[in-house]
Amino acid sequence: MRLSRYFLPILKENPKEAEIVSHRLMLRAGMIRQQSAGIYSWLPLGKRVLDKVNKIIREEQNRAGAIELLMPTLQTAELWQESGRYDDYGKEMLRIKDRQDRQMLYGPTNEEMITDIFRSYVKSYKNLPLNLYHIQLKFRDEVRPRFGTMRSREFLMKDAYSFDLTKEDAIHSYNKMFVAYLRTFERLGLRAIPMRADTGPIGGNHSHEFIILADTGESEVFCHKSFLDRAIPAESTDFDDVAALQGVFDEWTADYAATSEMHDDAAYDAIPEGERLSARGIEVGHIFYFGTKYSEPMGAKVQGKDGKEHPVHMGSYGIGPTRLVPAIIEASHDENGIIWPASVAPFDVVIINMKAGDAACDAACEKLYYQLSNAGKDVLYDDTDDRAGQKFATADLIGVPVQIIVGPRSVANGEVEVKDRKTGERETVTIEAAMNKALG
């Protein structure tokens, strides 16, 4: 992508409305634009990052055996009345009427709708286990939306729903998602710590939040330091191995970890003093096992091996991609801007032409641009006639991992400069060597 033809509305000044680093940087880098309180447009740079986050989420959901579908944002009030939850959400739920005067709502979550889909088609235990997920916009009318897309009213959510014949089977499905979440956050460049959680209006009696540590986090967290360097389950993990997944779950929940809402002073004090960690954290995922809370009232039953009908045991598993993007920024930035993990960076490499219009510089940049693009890399080519300082500031602000700086003097020697955005290290190398570095 040539920067001269790209839509990248950079802000030179810090927006006054931004309270935290991620909100400030997302606005300055031209990733998002606020349309109204808690509602944002995702501009091209932000959309590229969001798409890469969603791609990783999808890959790990699919690896764990979940199947993607897509449910609508608008739901009928009847389903929520059937489950008994219609009044639980209060003013958070946006309620509307269509032209036929039917009560509708903008879905804050999808337990009722997915249960309705399940009961319409699945009648036998032979079709279980089943895990269905989608990535869709949700709306919750927050009293005080803040922090940009970290706590917005409209947001994108990946929610998965598992269906099993027995509680034991449902716990295995829960453990699958537990492991999938650990892997997802690791691939996003985050260390997420699972913590026992309150189930809230979703319901159930078994729930974990996944929290990343960040100074701007809304939650106070207490945990054992061992979580910071614990090994993440490998890509080769067998998700059908019940004992192995239970082992992973047991390992990750054996040491103390809790938010302030669930904090136990005595349990925390039992940790050796040098191993205690108290910090702020951001919730990036939440999983629930709620048994038959929805299947019982909504008649989601299957015929068991005994020939009798049984309500299915369900779980719900949420990740907010539009919340994850600022969470990644909170965990990875410096005074100059964003430092994206390579897995979600909007571009893999930025080529900075220090003298656009110079024949040698243009030729070297074009060669790098086409060869890296043809090799499958996402390349941003700064071919503008902006000043050098502005080009460097833009590259640092948007956080592209590798910068290739092409100037007349170095090109005359067949060389360019390569900068690592994360470390700040620079080195002068041949054009061919720069190509190899960018290719990884």
From Swiss-Prot:
Record-level GO cellular component terms: cytosol
EC number: 6.1.1.15
PROSITE patterns per the UniProt record, alphabetical: AA_TRNA_LIGASE_II
Principal place of residence: cytoplasm
A Pfam family it matches: tRNA-synt_2b
Entry keyword annotation includes Protein transport: no
Domain of life: Bacteria
CDD domains: ProRS_anticodon_short, ProRS_core_prok
GO biological process terms, semicolon-separated: prolyl-tRNA aminoacylation
Reaction(s) the record says it catalyses: tRNA(Pro) + L-proline + ATP = L-prolyl-tRNA(Pro) + AMP + diphosphate
Presence of the UniProt keyword Magnesium in the record: no
GO molecular function: ATP binding; proline-tRNA ligase activity
Known role: Catalyzes the attachment of proline to tRNA(Pro) in a two-step reaction: proline is first activated by ATP to form Pro-AMP and then transferred to the acceptor end of tRNA(Pro).
HAMAP family, sorted: Pro_tRNA_synth_type2
Record text on subunit structure and interactions: Homodimer.
Protein name: Proline--tRNA ligase
Organism of this sequence: Agrobacterium fabrum (strain C58 / ATCC 33970) (Agrobacterium tumefaciens (strain C58))
Source lineage: Bacteria, Pseudomonadati, Pseudomonadota, Alphaproteobacteria, Hyphomicrobiales
